Regions:
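Folded extracytoplasmic luminal domains of secretory or organellar precursors
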Residues: 2-285
Length: 285
């Protein structure tokens, strides 16, 4: 988790079908620790004001290295992938209205600033990968604590350091579809998973980006709902006292209710700590 400031994994055989998320009950929720310093403060109304173009008003700060990816992973559990493609450090920690107790993980937003002379006015796209639970993130209806890279990307050419020096910005933002350019959804079987318990971190969903529900099915079985564990991790337990049987098929339901079914997503012989990348994904629009 995070407080605003101013300022691989081994991929098992590529599956022809998606995988299914299930998550570890006992894993602690990761925290991103940040120092908080500002030169000025401002407040916004409790309800974001929307413009005619569909933009809403909010606030932004940044954290971590000026040219980095914020925290090393964040409260969604994406770990070092936040600095790698396709995220490429263009990420943000969301205040409560954006992080949504982890249900907002993976959602994409365009953000632009216009109230500072260093602002370019051009929108940048970020993915929610972390939580910002205090400070301005609580005081504002919508607040993005952005990576130094993403914050600086809102600046005019050669003005990134000047914009980061401002520390706090009024911004405009809107939700947009995620587009990972042909990448399939990946599923990382979490540490602690065993024959009776399966936990999976799910990422790189096109379109809505977030997930509202996940179901898993054993061979010849029925769809069983999985529980949201934390961040982008979902979990399932054996309800029969017998080991769970792979391969597992997975049914994903996005935040907007779009369903994607992946047959035989996680293979027999799966191992905790391994990532299985499918070759399918939601449409990006």
């Amino acid at each position: 988790m995070a407080t605003p400031i101013t300022l691989a994994f081994a991929v098992l055989p590529i599956l022809s079908l998606l995988v299914s998320p299930i998550s570890c009950h006992g894993n602690p929720r990761p925290m991103s620790l940040r120092n908080y310093t500002t030169t000025s403060r401002y407040t916004t109304s409790s309800v974001p004001a929307k413009s005619a173009a569909g933009w809403s008003s909010g606030g932004a700060t940044w954290y971590g290295s000026p040219y980095g990816a914020g925290s090393d992973g964040g409260a969604c559990g994406y770990q070092g992938t936040v600095s790698q493609r396709p995220f490429s450090s263009m990420i943000a920690a969301g205040g409560p209205s954006l992080f949504k107790n982890g249900n907002g993980c993976g959602a994409c937003y365009q953000i632009k600033c216009t109230g500072n002379k260093a602002c370019s006015g051009r929108p940048v796209t970020v993915t929610i990968t972390d939580s910002c639970p205090g400070g301005l993130c609580l005081a504002e209806a919508a607040h993005f604590d952005m990576s130094g890279t993403a914050f600086g990307a809102m600046a005019s050419r050669g003005m990134a350091d000047r914009l980061r020096a401002a520390g706090i910005l009024k911004i405009q933002y809107k939700r947009v579809p995620c587009n990972y350019n042909g990448m399939g959804i990946s599923f990382k079987v979490a540490a602690g998973s065993n024959p009776f318990y399966l936990a999976v971190l799910i990422q790189y969903q096109n379109g809505d980006g977030d997930l509202a529900a996940v179901h898993v099915m054993e061979p010849g079985g029925v769809w069983t709902p999985m529980q949201h564990s934390w961040g982008a991790t979902w979990r399932a337990n054996s309800n029969t006292g017998k080991p769970l049987r792979a391969p597992f098929s997975v049914r994903l339901t996005s935040g907007a209710g779009k369903v994607l079914v992946v047959r035989n997503a996680i293979p027999a012989g799966w191992r905790a700590g391994r990532t299985y990348r499918s070759t399918v994904n939601y449409y990006a629009t």
